[in-house]
Amino acid sequence: MVSARALLWAICVLRVALATVYFQEEFLDGERWRNRWVQSTNDSQFGHFRVSSGKFYGHKEKDKGLQTTQNSRFYAISASFKPFSNKGKTLVIQYTVKHEQKMDCGGGYIKVFPSDLDQKKMNGKSQYYIMFGPDICGFDIKKVHVILYFKNQYHENKKPIRCKVDGFTHLYTLILRPDLSYEVKVDGQSIESGSIEYDWNLTSLRKTEKTSLDSRDWDQVEGSKVQDWEKHFLDAGASKPSDWNSELDGDWLQKPPYEDGLKAEGIDKDVWLHQKMRPAGYLTQYDLSEFENIGAIGLELWQVRSGTIFDNFLITDDEEYAEKFGKATWGETKGPEKEMDAIQAKEEVKKAREEDEEDLLMGKFHRHNHFSRFHRQGEL
């Protein structure tokens, strides 16, 4: 008999097996990455990328990724894949980024584009669906961008989400669900979540109902004056007041007393139902969490100091698969990466001390020679 644990494990394996992976990139095949990634030539001054694991790493091959190489440059590179729509599905976007140069000002975010992106001409004005990831500049800007594109406008999450600012590799994950919830994870830990509607101020774009002031198809029957109309409005016993001024008060008319039970005749009494009106910015529920033609992922950013490494790109519809992929990549190398950095730091400290001691000894030697020369000169 199959145990409950074995059955549960089998279900988990099956679920991961059924996950749809739209894009996955680890740069494990040497220079073949150049066949998949397109460097934009829109500007001859765009910075260039190389594939490298950097100055320190957890695994020399597994930690290789796209690295920026030139200071004070804009960068633009992208990779395309088979277009898809995430309608009614979860969308997970994940990647790793390492600012080993200790970023002072520059972007570490990615962009997800529609399939009609002109990769050769990609630039800062190219339309994108999603912008996600860290952005650092000075002391003021240390945030995770989550920008979504709706109705020809870019909307940024109104919550401040802080990014990592050290020089190690970090795993960034964005999850958009069809129930209009979202979640942002850093290093596998949830740091922000909520409603797409409210955290992007999109409630005004949702479907609303307005009562119309008039209805074009309303068939109002025209009434006609009844034969004894005057008797309802003239009072034979009434007389004109003595102080009535026709020039100021107008013509005086006899007014009948109110008759209880007076009913209107010849009037359409059907119930009139208001129409449902759609405002100009009308969006259905799914419009707030779906993108019809996702077909490319890329880096379009500015950096003052280069050296950032981007790796382990993933776009899928399965949160569990993304979690397992993160553990199998970043999770396996994060520890050894820190160990290598610590070893290098100790070696640098040791080298600096040796250089200081050498400088000190050389300084004493020079001072001794100078004194000897001065003493000999005094004897002459």
Swiss-Prot record:
Leader sequence segment: 1-19
Consequence of gene loss (knockout): Defective sperm migration from the uterus into the oviduct and defective binding to the zona pellucida.
Region described as C-domain: spans on this chain: 292-380
Amino-acid positions noted as binding an alpha-D-glucoside in the UniProt annotation, renumbered to this chain: Y109, K111, Y128, D135, E300
Matches recorded under InterPro entries: Calret/calnex, Calret/calnex_CS, Calreticulin, Calreticulin/calnexin_P_dom_sf, ConA-like_dom_sf
Intervals holding Sequence repeats: 191-202, 209-220, 222-231, 235-246, 250-256, 260-268, 270-280
Name of the protein in question: Calreticulin-3
